[in-house]
Amino acid sequence: MKRSELKIGLALSGGGIRAAIYHLGVLKYLAENNLLEQVTHISSVSGASMCVGLLYAKNNMRFPTSSEYLTTILPTLKEQILNVNLEQKAIIEAIFKFKFNKKANAIALALAKHWGINGGFGDISKKPLWSVVCTSYETGKHFRFSQDIVGDWAFGYIKDSNFPLADAIAASAAFPFLIGTYEIDTKPFEWCDKSGTKIEPKSDKLHLWDGGVYDNFGLEPIYQMENNGMYSDDVNFSILSNAGKSISFQSKKTVTRIVDVTTDQISILRARAFRDFIFRNKNGYYPKNGSGI
């Protein structure tokens, strides 16, 4: 396939600030090979969503060229991530602005206030498409924010939404037990089903968790496992950047261990299917934390 024909999808996994830093390196590798211009779709989870949101915020809401990324954006992002303790800022916001059970909403405020992530999806460039992946508590499905769609097939979709970037990112990073759900008031929005027909929301409140509860790779917007694997229409080559770490040994201690084991096994199955797909079709890469690129 010619370079000019590439339509690259980036699936950037969760993993907190560690993931954000790892993904900066993957983007650097693409920029060094003048490939950022070929990126057509970015799907991000948790810390990766923070990374991409900061990238847009520091580049006038545009996805950077390879040259811009290397000379200006990467140094700026590194300084911001390393010098601003977002977790500490979010805790302060939670104490003074919200009830402490709304820590995810406090993260949104901290992202806007301390990282400068303002505006909505309607303010960022149309290409590449950016899908911020969350998990719906109510439906148990993959809930997505992007320039052209907000919602999931089981709950419905928001029409004409310019949803705030910081809020979508905070929802994507709302890890159960540590942070809790991000809460959305559904009443101000007009909802529709997949065909575009107006519907009434199933509840007044919608609660979103970290996208990693459903898919820590953020693969689904780009790659589907059906029919031996297939890409979305806007992608013909993809890179799964896995910044996660393997499950470690732990003595019996907490019930949350069952979540660790289940999530790890789901990720392993997704990774195996994706690796098999790109091996058969020669149309992707799978860099993993600790294994290089």
Regions found by a protein language model. Give the residues of each.
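Non-catalytic peripheral regions of patatin-like phospholipases
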Residues: 60-107, 147-150, 160, 198-293
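Patatin-like phospholipase
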Residues: 3-11, 16-107, 146-147
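Conserved acidic residues
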Residues: 9, 40, 129, 206, ...
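Short beta-strand segments
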Residues: 44, 133-135, 239-241
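Conserved N-terminal structural segment that caps and organizes enzyme catalytic cores in eukaryotes
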Residues: 106-125
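Short helix-terminating capping/connector loops at secondary-structure junctions
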Residues: 3-5, 35-38, 121-127, 230-234
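Flexible loop/turn segments at secondary-structure boundaries
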Residues: 17-20, 49-52, 139-141, 215-217, ...
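Active-site gating loop/helix substructures
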Residues: 18, 125-225
